[in-house]
């Protein structure tokens, strides 16, 4: 069994990944949120920090690339190889409209002929391992048999499938029937991704698909950072675990990010997922959300930890 951390844009940065690794770990691979491949070979300052080997020490990190241009993909992959990476991931799953309208992410799935040419070029021109993260299609799962014909032509490190279509975003439920059909015909190793929010969710998916050996989790980890540890038979997070995790995240953001506003933007996003682990936390979560200065934020966080009973995943 292998467990992977999904790449979540704007959230699972190197700061988040390092804190998660130090406090909980449990993951075999940590996927880095997508890098937009471009003709300009220079990575941005943020991208350089995210892919820096120093900031991913001890982890098997996999950078994700977003593009529909094969040459741009290859340039970016080769540059990542110089950083020491052995594997890259192609993003064919992002449902964001700003990405899809450019024909990237899940938007690329609507162009199967172009996608096939793209894959043919990148797999023939690099010796790096390439995994693919995909959805079932743009509009409906009936699009996927054609996509599978394409995917089966190429020696992927893994095919990571989120069994929703683009228009679902994160609504509805994963199409497990379609996933099972895909699993039966895939010539590549398949990884399951989608709606694993608890150890029970994991057991349910694993029992339904016993041949699947790899599972990717994203939002479930944001809501319970100890989820991978729990799945592996370890203990669930307690309040002190979450406090340690929070403090490490917060202090690192203060060191790495300039300005209270930017630091608090990051932390408020984290609390959107963490607050439900505490009973009767709405009042304090609101204070956290309204805080505009770090000193006010710190006071609100201390109040929440002091006054709200920690219930963990049961309060979701």
Where are these regions (language model features)?
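Flavin-dependent oxidoreductase catalytic cores
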Residues: 1-316
């Amino acid at each position: 069994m292998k467990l992977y951390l999904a790449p979540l844009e704007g959230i699972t940065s190197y700061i988040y990944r390092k804190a998660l690794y130090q406090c909980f770990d449990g993951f075999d691979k940590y996927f880095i949120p997508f890098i937009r491949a471009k003709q300009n070979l220079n990575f941005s300052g943020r991208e350089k920090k995210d892919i820096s080997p120093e900031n991913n020490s001890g982890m098997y990190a996999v950078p994700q690339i977003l593009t529909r241009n094969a040459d741009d993909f290859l340039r970016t992959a080769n540059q990542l190889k110089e950083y020491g990476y052995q594997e890259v991931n192609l993003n064919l799953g992002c449902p964001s409209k700003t990405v899809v309208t450019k024909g990237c992410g899940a938007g690329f799935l609507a162009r199967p002929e172009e996608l096939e040419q793209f894959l043919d070029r990148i797999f023939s021109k690099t010796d790096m391992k390439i995994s693919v993260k995909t959805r079932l299609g743009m509009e409906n799962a009936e699009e996927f048999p054609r996509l599978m014909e394409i995917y089966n032509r190429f020696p992927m490190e893994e095919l990571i499938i989120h069994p929703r279509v683009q228009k679902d975003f994160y609504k509805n439920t994963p199409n497990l029937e379609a996933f099972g059909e895909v699993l039966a015909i895939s010539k590549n190793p398949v990884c399951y991704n989608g709606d694993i929010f608890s150890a029970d969710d994991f057991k349910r998916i694993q029992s339904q698909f016993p041949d699947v050996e790899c599972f990717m989790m994203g939002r479930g980890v944001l809501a319970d950072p100890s989820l991978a540890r729990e799945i592996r038979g370890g203990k669930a997070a307690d309040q002190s675990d979450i406090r340690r995790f929070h403090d490490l995240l917060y202090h690192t953001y203060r060191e790495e990010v300039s300005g209270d506003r930017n630091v608090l933007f990051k932390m408020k996003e984290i609390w959107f997922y963490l607050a439900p682990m505490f009973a009767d936390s709405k009042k304090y979560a609101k204070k956290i959300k309204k805080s505009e200065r770090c000193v006010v934020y710190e006071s609100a966080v201390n109040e929440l930890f002091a006054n709200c009973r920690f219930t963990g995943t049961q309060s979701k």
